[in-house]
């Protein structure tokens, strides 16, 4: 098949992180046609021929399928009451210390069946796809113990088999169960990680005030590295307790949150060739101060934007995340598009297949109903996504229902 009458393809190019000035570099192919064969982009031309079965883009903009590299989208229950607590002045840390927050989701998840969690999670994923996401990272983390974590892993694998999106599975050492010692639980998590090894690609840890210490995070990630897994870390969301420095000797693909990063952290991340993932939707949910992306980009650190959808931040709309990053973190629209495509794909080890509209890559394509790509973050209040292709298959059409 082919997609014809494309107003312009707007895409970064290449297979790896874009940093510094390169993060704002995009290619433009006007009046284009995309040929799709066997789920791949076979050819891109500037011809105008039209045959039966072609899809007419009607002059719209085409961008790469968006890549959401940090999510907590698999869980049971909800935390709507917590929203009102935060609105009345309670902080994230206060709610967590009271045994709620993440711990409430742990209880809700334990009390939900795998089928219930799958159904809830697929609704959230369908919404993400409707806003242009074609690849999504799926974390465990709300089980804490092996039986419940395996339930979440099974749900993640079932989502992977749905065909709606491409997935990358991550085991997350999330929070310390009440009454457990950190050292003992870290060793226990290593055992879970070993048993999950054949089904996941990444290991992640929440290293912050009220979560795991730098020493525990380092030990866990070092163990994961020895297993050959990719490494990610939540750091500097609540406070800066030295997680970046502690893990600087490891091959961490991305340091996520980074609200309280200092100059030493930025230089460390740049020097080891890693990246920073900004999560503006969570900052929005918590009403915190947004980190300044200019500090990272101008220092030569690749910046990624992800949704961080969770019970706290019930939002997987990467276009709204781009809007927030442009408005509050001083990113250019070009940088924001790169952050949600090739940089996010590279952080998941998928840069050779995902994140750009180029010949030979997976046909993950989003048709956007705008006249210019700069309107994408601007028109955040309406869904401008017309159609979404995943591996060459139409998985979302605004005028039709999902093919679940």
From Swiss-Prot:
Task: Give the family this protein belongs to, as stated in its UniProt record.
Answer: Belongs to the metallo-dependent hydrolases superfamily. HutI family.
Which cofactors go with this protein?
Zn(2+); Fe(3+)
**Gene Ontology molecular functions:** imidazolonepropionase activity; iron ion binding; zinc ion binding
Q: Which residues bind Fe(3+)?
A: 70, 72, 234, 308
Q: Where does 4-imidazolone-5-propanoate bind?
A: 79, 142, 174, 237
Primary location group = cytoplasm
Q: Per the UniProt entry, what species is this protein from, by scientific name?
A: Thermoplasma volcanium (strain ATCC 51530 / DSM 4299 / JCM 9571 / NBRC 15438 / GSS1)
Tell me the cofactor note: Binds 1 zinc or iron ion per subunit.
One biological-process term from Gene Ontology? L-histidine catabolic process to glutamate and formate
Protein name per its UniProtKB record:
Imidazolonepropionase
Give me the reactions it catalyses. 4-imidazolone-5-propanoate + H2O = N-formimidoyl-L-glutamate
Q: Which Pfam families match?
A: Amidohydro_1 (PF01979)
Provide one Gene Ontology cellular component. Answer: cytoplasm
Query: Which residues are listed for Zn(2+) binding in this entry?
Result: 70, 72, 234, 308
- Please provide the record's keywords in A-Z order: Cytoplasm, Histidine metabolism, Hydrolase, Iron, Metal-binding, Zinc
| EC id | 3.5.2.7
What InterPro entries does the database record attribute to this sequence? Amidohydro-rel, HutI, Metal-dep_hydrolase_composite, Metal_Hydrolase
Q: What does this protein do?
A: Catalyzes the hydrolytic cleavage of the carbon-nitrogen bond in imidazolone-5-propanoate to yield N-formimidoyl-L-glutamate. It is the third step in the universal histidine degradation pathway.
> Cellular location of this protein?
Cytoplasm
Question: Which residues of the sequence carry a binding annotation for N-formimidoyl-L-glutamate?
Answer: 142
Q: In which pathway does it act?
A: Amino-acid degradation; L-histidine degradation into L-glutamate; N-formimidoyl-L-glutamate from L-histidine: step 3/3
Class of enzymatic activity (EC top level): hydrolase
């Amino acid at each position: 098949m082919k997609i014809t009458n494309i107003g312009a393809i707007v895409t970064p190019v290449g297979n790896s992180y874009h940093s510094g000035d390169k993060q704002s570099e995009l290619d433009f192919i006007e009046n284009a046609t995309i040929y799709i064969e066997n789920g791949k982009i076979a050819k891109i031309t500037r011809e105008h021929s039209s045959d039966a079965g072609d899809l007419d883009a009607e002059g719209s903009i085409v961008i790469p399928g968006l890549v959401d590299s940090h999510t907590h989208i698999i869980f049971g229950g909800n935390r709507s009451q917590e929203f009102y607590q935060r609105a009345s002045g309670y902080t994230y840390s206060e709610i967590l210390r009271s045994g709620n927050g993440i711990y409430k989701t742990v209880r809700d998840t334990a009390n939900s069946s795998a089928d219930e969690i799958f159904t809830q999670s697929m609704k959230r994923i369908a919404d993400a796809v409707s806003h242009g996401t074609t690849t999504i990272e799926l974390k465990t983390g709300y089980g804490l113990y092996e039986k419940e974590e395996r339930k979440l892993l099974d749900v993640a694998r079932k989502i992977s088999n749905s065909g709606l999106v491409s997935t990358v599975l991550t085991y997350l050492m999330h929070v310390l169960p009440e009454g457990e010692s950190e050292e003992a639980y870290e060793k226990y998590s290593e055992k879970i990680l070993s048993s999950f090894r054949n089904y996941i690609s990444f290991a992640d840890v929440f290293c912050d005030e009220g979560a795991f210490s730098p020493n525990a995070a380092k030990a866990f990630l070092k163990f994961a590295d020895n297993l050959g897994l990719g490494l990610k870390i939540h750091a500097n969301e609540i406070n800066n307790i030295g997680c970046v420095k502690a893990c600087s000797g490891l091959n961490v693909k991305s340091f996520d949150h980074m609200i309280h990063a200092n100059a030493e952290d930025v230089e460390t991340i740049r020097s080891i060739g890693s990246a920073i993932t900004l999560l503006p939707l969570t900052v929005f949910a918590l009403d915190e101060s947004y980190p300044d992306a200019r500090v990272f980009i101008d220092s030569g650190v690749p910046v990624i934007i992800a949704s961080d959808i969770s019970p706290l931040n019930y939002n997987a709309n990467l276009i709204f995340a781009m809007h927030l990053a442009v408005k509050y973190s001083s990113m250019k629209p070009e940088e924001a598009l790169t952050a949600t495509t090739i940089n996010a794909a590279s952080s998941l080890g998928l840069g050779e297949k995902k994140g750009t509209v180029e010949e030979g890559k997976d046909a993950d394509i989003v048709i956007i109903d705008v006249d210019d790509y700069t309107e994408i973050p601007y028109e955040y209040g309406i869904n401008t996504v017309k159609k979404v292709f995943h591996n060459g298959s139409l998985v979302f059409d605004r005028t039709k229902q999902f093919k679940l």
